[in-house]
UniProtKB/Swiss-Prot annotation:
InterPro entries: UppP (IPR003824). This is Undecaprenyl-diphosphatase 2. Pfam families: BacA (PF02673). It catalyses: di-trans,octa-cis-undecaprenyl diphosphate + H2O = di-trans,octa-cis-undecaprenyl phosphate + phosphate + H(+). It is a multi-pass membrane protein. It is an enzyme of class 3 (hydrolase). It comes from Rhodospirillum rubrum (strain ATCC 11170 / ATH 1.1.1 / DSM 467 / LMG 4362 / NCIMB 8255 / S1). GO terms for biological process: cell wall organization; peptidoglycan biosynthetic process; regulation of cell shape; response to antibiotic. The lineage of its organism: Bacteria, Pseudomonadati, Pseudomonadota, Alphaproteobacteria, Rhodospirillales. The gene is uppP2. It is found in: Cell inner membrane. It comes from the Bacteria. The chain crosses the membrane at residues 47-64, 82-102, 110-130, 185-205, 219-239, 249-269. Catalyzes the dephosphorylation of undecaprenyl diphosphate (UPP). Confers resistance to bacitracin.
Length: 274
């Protein structure tokens, strides 16, 4: 197998793992990185991304395995477990409905570097604005959330259908707006990623099953493992980071990165492809 392709697979796995749970948009980074690296054709690259995304999902499941095991064990008798699962389901549904309705149109028109870069900048400005507002904390732990809180965050997640917006960014910043603590908003975003990303990945994998190629198995394995390990580091690091800091640094990163992409596109320095 081509060593260069394996290195590219590892790079994309690293990009997915690091960016999936940070408020900087994994989809946006993968679109830009995939275009820059010229990795596979567009359809095969899409299948590869689906597989490495599952690695990131597995990482958050592993990190919160005790909590998830307790929830499953408590479904027969613990009302709090049912409340937790119900809140996840309520938050999960809005993106499903809008994704199935508008997913094809969004992919056709917005899945290219320049629209993604624009979304990076807009999202960064929103985070800066959100961090400068006062947010009275009403919910300090995920278990204190009501179904209304879950629905609001689910609606916020719908903005992430626009590539470059960031699913974690939309849900975390939305949670802050709605009165959740940084810890509660971030952890609920992690938990919400499990059904949301799993459903999206399996649905896309089923639609593209004809493209599954045994020749890609090595690339997928490398990308999956790197994605899992880097996502594990990112999840643990973000929880530590937010205990002492806000999200301003991510906002400035988004703005700077978006401006660089737009500048290289407009100057002709980089010929971005879809």
């Amino acid at each position: 197998m081509d060593l260069v392709m394996l290195i590219k697979a590892a790079i994309l796995g690293l990009v997915e793992g690091i960016t999936e749970f940070l408020p900087i948009s994994s989809t946006g980074h993968l679109i830009i990185a995939g275009s820059l690296l010229d990795f596979l054709d567009e359809q095969k690259r899409d299948v590869f991304v689906i597989v490495i995304q599952l690695g990131a999902i597995l990482a958050v499941c592993w990190e919160y395995r005790r909590r998830l095991t307790d929830v499953v064990a408590g479904l027969g008798s613990d009302p709090q477990s049912w409340k937790f699962v119900t809140n996840l389901l309520i938050a999960f549904l809005p993106a499903v409905v809008l994704g199935l309705t508008f997913g094809k149109a969004i992919k056709a028109h917005l899945f290219s570097p320049v629209p993604v870069a624009t979304a990076f900048i807009v999202g960064g400005l929103v985070i800066l604005w959100a961090e400068r507002r006062r947010h009275p904390i009403r919910v300090r732990e995920v278990d204190e959330m009501t179904w209304v809180d879950a629905l609001k965050i689910g609606l916020a997640q719908c903005f992430a259908l626009i590539p470059g917006t960031s699913r974690s960014g939309a849900t975390i910043i939305g949670g802050l707006f709605f009165g959740l603590s940084r810890k509660a908003a971030t952890e609920f975003s992690f938990f919400l990623a499990i059904p949301t990303l799993t459903a999206a990945s399996l649905y896309d994998l089923y639609k593209n099953r004809a493209l599954l190629d045994g020749d890609m198995s090595g690339l997928m394995a490398v990308g999956f493992v790197v994605s899992f390990l880097s996502a594990l580091v990112a999840v643990r690091g973000l929880i530590r980071y937010i205990s002492r800091h806000d999200f301003t640094v991510f906002a400035w990163y988004r703005i700077a990165f978006g401006l660089v992409v737009l500048a290289t596109a407009w100057s002709g320095l980089v010929s971005w492809s879809a």
